[in-house]
Amino acid sequence: MADQKQRVTVIGGGLAGTECAYQLSRRGVPVVLREMKPQKRSPAHKSDTLAELVCSNSLRSDNPESAIGLLHAELRALGSLVLSAADANRVPAGDALAVERERFSAAITESLLRQPGVELVAGEVEQLPEDGPVVIATGPLTSDALTRELERHVGTRLYFYDSIAPILSADSIDMNVAFRQSRYGKGGGDDYLNLPMTKDEYYRFIAEVKAGQKVVPHAFEEPKYFEGCLPIEVMAERGDDTLAYGPMKPVGLRDPRTGQEPYAVVQLRMEDVGGTSWNMVGFQTRLTWGEQKRIFSSFIPGLQQAEFLRMGQIHRNTFIDSPRLLAKDLSLKTEPRLYFAGQISGVEGYVESAACGYLVALALHARLTGTEFVPPPATTAMGALLRHVTGEAHPPDYPHQPSNISFGIFSPLTGRMKKAEKRAAYSARAKQDLAAWLPHAGVPAAGAPEHVDQRSA
């Protein structure tokens, strides 16, 4: 019988929870996987299987010279359950990794049911276990009862709506138009990039935002916006000048080309410490991704050649302020036996959630065996994702928002390169550094973790 103190409870049978449970069990750690289905479902879920894909059957690009494709490759090298199931149930989709979703979920469910040391327990969790390690991987639609329980542990740093502004590659911003300056010279004096607009440019932009195609929310996503974080199109509908007195206000700024205060500005804030990516401040939006690219590139001066590393969006999401709450191993600073994995920690996307679950499994296994958790290098996709969750990829006090993997959160490259060359360089560097790190994950070249039996510990 396993020592109950060494038995890990994983709450949530999505991509993060299933990957975490599988990787722990492969390393000899006994796991109880708690999933509320089939007794109860969130408004988004329809099936009784684990790892249900809700919004899309695509795991996005499989090109290893894209950030997400690089993450796919790293997870394959690590022996990921999710990537193995995806590859086995792939459907034609160009260079995207798309899956037959029912077979994909069934494959993961069957793998875990067959896995020694994994006990699957159905039913809603309303209170966290009082003893032993616990991994919370309940996703963006965490049940109301468990949400109330989590609030007892994390306080006010639990958020319920996800408002994401677009992120741009620094190399794609026209620096002949943009100028560095903070309002009234505050902070460092030049912490922001500013894209100035004339009166005519501003009103043309507003007209396009109001007319642009918007994403229709899911039935379970009743729009309830915070006044301090409204979508730009909602502000524009309140009046043509609302944005000019809000996030686009020009006060305290002077365009060095004219010496005058612009009529309006789009401000960009540094997204990573290397300054390779910039966030469009206050530009959370429900415009479709195609409309965002069209409107922002065509009607904001300086963005005509813009490369979008992340698109803006707003949707229902439950997540914690991980950089302030979690230690470097993704455990809660105030209660180290509690770990957070997946979207609730602030990653966005199926594959990113699985990767986060894998990282938690490594960190927890290290703690249980009394060994050091060696995080993946910041030059790898796995390492970049971890640094996003812990806040290391961003400037101090940067507001935590869920994010997909992008090259903007990687350790930056040096020197100027063309876009294709830069992506190839990121990929080559990551591949080399991951190979050197794999032994720290207990993974030989074949991608199967070396077995350490924790059940007898």
From Swiss-Prot:
EC number(s) given by UniProt: 2.1.1.74
Listed cofactors: FAD
Known catalytic reactions: uridine(54) in tRNA + (6R)-5,10-methylene-5,6,7,8-tetrahydrofolate + NADH + H(+) = 5-methyluridine(54) in tRNA + (6S)-5,6,7,8-tetrahydrofolate + NAD(+); uridine(54) in tRNA + (6R)-5,10-methylene-5,6,7,8-tetrahydrofolate + NADPH + H(+) = 5-methyluridine(54) in tRNA + (6S)-5,6,7,8-tetrahydrofolate + NADP(+)
Domain of life where this protein originates: Bacteria
Keywords from the named record: Cytoplasm, FAD, Flavoprotein, Methyltransferase, NAD, NADP, Transferase, tRNA processing
Binding site residues for FAD: 12-17
Protein localization: Cytoplasm
Gene Ontology terms for molecular function: flavin adenine dinucleotide binding; tRNA (uracil(54)-C5)-methyltransferase activity, 5,10-methylenetetrahydrofolate-dependent
Listed InterPro entries: FAD/NAD-bd_sf (IPR036188), MnmG-rel (IPR002218), MnmG_N (IPR040131), TrmFO (IPR004417)
Any GO CC annotation of this UniProt entry: cytosol
GO biological process, any: tRNA wobble uridine modification
Location (main, coarse): cytoplasm
Pfam short name (any one): GIDA
General function of this protein: Catalyzes the folate-dependent formation of 5-methyl-uridine at position 54 (M-5-U54) in all tRNAs.
Assigned protein family: Belongs to the MnmG family. TrmFO subfamily.
Name recorded for this polypeptide: Methylenetetrahydrofolate--tRNA-(uracil-5-)-methyltransferase TrmFO
Species this chain originates from: Myxococcus xanthus (strain DK1622)
Lineage: Bacteria, Pseudomonadati, Myxococcota, Myxococcia, Myxococcales
